Amino acid sequence: MNSFVSTVLLLSVTIALVSGYPSQLQTTCVTKAKSCTMFFLNGVYCTECTYSGTLELKIGSTCTFSIYEKKVASQPNENSQNEVAQCKQSSCYSNQFVPVDCAAAFGNEYITYIENQ
C-alpha cells in the first residue's frame, strides 16, 4: 500500500510539472517612436505628430510583424487621417503587408504603450 501511495504521489507531481511547462516558446519585440512637425497655416501655429510602432510576435515557428501608425494634427484638414490608426501586418519572412485591424494586430496593451509617449 505504501508503494501505491508513493507511485500516485510521484505521478501527480510529474503531471503538475509537465502541465506547467509551456508547449511553445513565445517571444515579443515592441518598438515605438513619436515624431512631430510644427508649421504655420493661415496664420495659425499647428503641429502634426506621428505615433508609430512595430510588434514582432513569435509563437513556436509562427512569426508575424505588425506596423502601427497614427497621425494627430492640431489643425486637421478634410484630407487628414487625424486620430485614425492605420495598421498592416505580414509574416516575419515576407515584405508583403496587408491592412489589418489595429486592435487585432497589437491588442490594447501595446496600442496604449505606443501612444503614451
UniProtKB/Swiss-Prot annotation:
Keywords: Secreted, Signal. Residues 1-20 form the signal peptide. GO terms for cellular component: extracellular region. It is found in: Secreted. Its main location: secreted. Belongs to the UPF0375 family. This is UPF0375 protein C08F11.12.
